[in-house]
């Protein structure tokens, strides 16, 4: 089947990018930086820890919530990773590192109410994700792929046509979560969609099947076990990583991938 990206006008909104330098003090606090040209935090080796991130960022949503995120790698193809309920952006760090090594820019972030992000949990995920997409585009992304786990997958599916991304993938997505409804979105969505779910993860196995049936353009993988969302990586890490990277590569322009320069 030939996928055709749906062309929809994005809602106009202003995203305020608020960035500062991380202090190097032992307390790990954030020191303010008044430079209007700074676009990143500077991390010490201790700050980076096991995440492998190259930047820690803070950006603002349309309704003035401050969200914290981590940027991995560089390049003009950006992957925005959205976490599931009860977890935070760190659940995506292993895949973010892997994808950045391939040559993609990757953004993980905490939905409002999670981690250091302000606001009430499990509300207005659409605005949070919209702000995340605006951030990567403001800093050079020419193509964007959304990937989410559970509620993050539902939000990614619903928002994908509105922000005109290249493709969207979801791990164990419910058909709806709060005000976010993925089932309604897929009925008219022509953007490439990838669904991954465990075969014994009720009700999410059934939800993923419903999304697959309703969607016009879908790849569907049902894996053994009962793990949910990013917990699927614990049993199927290599397989899921391979599926995701293959999907991303199929629907993006590989000439935009960052290539590490070598000395001649």
Regions found by a protein language model. Give the residues of each.
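C-terminal motif of bacterial Sec signal peptides marking the signal peptidase cleavage site
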Residues: 22-24
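N-terminal cap/lid segment of alpha/beta-hydrolase-fold proteins
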Residues: 37-72
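The serine-hydrolase catalytic nucleophile loop
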Residues: 85-97, 206-207
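Alpha/beta-hydrolase active-site loop
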Residues: 91, 120-139
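Conserved alpha/beta-hydrolase
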Residues: 98-116
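Gly/Ala-rich beta-loop-alpha elbow adjacent to hydrolase catalytic centers
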Residues: 147-156
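Short beta-strand/loop motif that positions the catalytic acidic residue
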Residues: 189, 195-197
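Catalytic histidine-centered segment of alpha/beta-hydrolase-like enzymes
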Residues: 226-237
């Amino acid at each position: 089947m030939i996928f055709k990206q749906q062309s929809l006008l994005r809602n106009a909104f202003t995203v305020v990018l608020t960035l500062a330098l991380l202090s190097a003090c032992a307390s790990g606090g954030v020191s303010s930086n008044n430079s209007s040209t700074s676009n990143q935090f500077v991390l010490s080796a201790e700050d980076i820890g096991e995440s492998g991130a190259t930047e820690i960022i803070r950006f603002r949503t349309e309704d003035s919530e401050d969200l914290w995120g981590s940027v991995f790698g560089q390049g003009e193809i950006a992957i925005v990773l959205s976490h599931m309920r009860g977890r935070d952006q760190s659940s995506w760090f292993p895949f973010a590192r892997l994808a950045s090594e391939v040559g993609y820019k990757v953004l993980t972030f905490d939905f409002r109410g999670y981690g250091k992000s302000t606001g009430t949990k499990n509300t207005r995920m659409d605005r949070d994700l919209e702000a995340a997409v605006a951030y990567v585009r403001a800093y050079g992304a020419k193509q964007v792929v959304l990937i989410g786990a559970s509620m993050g997958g539902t939000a990614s599916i619903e928002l994908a046509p509105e922000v005109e991304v290249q493709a969207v993938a979801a791990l164990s997505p419910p058909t709806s979560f709060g005000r976010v409804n993925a089932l309604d979105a897929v009925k008219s969505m022509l953007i490439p969609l990838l669904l991954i779910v465990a075969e014994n993860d009720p009700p999410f196995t059934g939800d993923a099947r419903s999304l697959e049936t309703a969607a016009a353009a879908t790849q569907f993988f049902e894996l053994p076990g009962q793990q949910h969302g990013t917990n699927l990586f614990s049993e199927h890490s290599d397989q899921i990583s391979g599926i995701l990277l293959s999907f991303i590569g199929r629907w993006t322009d590989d000439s935009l991938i960052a290539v590490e320069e070598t000395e001649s």
